[in-house]
């Protein structure tokens, strides 16, 4: 998760600096992101579901990749970013409690190998470890 979180922190700082372009265009420029879908979720000004490509095994990238589901709710570039890490699945696309209280943007990440964030061809259970999840 640390690599994914680091990537998204960098994305958010970049988003705050890039004036004029929409979030959609900015997300399209990140090579690991695919299938960006705009959704209408209030109170966010922009809201997207997309997939982030991750290695199945961070210690052996030759084992292939899987797509991890991510939801991004954007209110404004100078708002804090609340990161929600979801196990089992993403239960709701609604604004979370902290995003509501802090009037923040929200990044919701589905845990590896749960719900829609699974490799094609089955789950290699030996790669569902705390270390692998932390490396995501």
Question: Where are these predicted regions, by residue range?
Answer:
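Alpha/beta-hydrolase active-site loop
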Residues: 127-136
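Glycine- and acidic
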Residues: 119-126
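Catalytic-loop region of hydrolases
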Residues: 19-105
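Bacterial Sec-dependent N-terminal signal peptides
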Residues: 1-22
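Active-site-proximal flexible loops/turns
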Residues: 9, 93, 115-117
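Conserved alpha/beta-hydrolase
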Residues: 101-118
């Amino acid at each position: 998760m640390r690599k994914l979180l680091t990537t998204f922190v960098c994305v958010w700082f970049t988003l705050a600096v890039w004036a004029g372009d929409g979030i959609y265009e900015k997300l399209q420029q990140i090579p690991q992101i695919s299938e960006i879908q705009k959704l209408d979720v209030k109170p966010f000004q922009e809201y997207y579901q997309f997939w982030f490509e991750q290695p199945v095994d961070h210690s052996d990238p030759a084992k292939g990749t899987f797509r991890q589901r991510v939801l991004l709710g954007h209110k404004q570039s100078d708002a804090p970013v609340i990161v929600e890490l979801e196990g089992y699945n993403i239960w709701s696309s609604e604004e979370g409690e902290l995003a509501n209280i802090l009037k923040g943007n929200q990044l919701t990440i589905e845990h590896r190998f749960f719900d829609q964030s699974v490799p094609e061809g089955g789950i290699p259970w030996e790669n569902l470890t705390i270390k692998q999840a932390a490396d995501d």
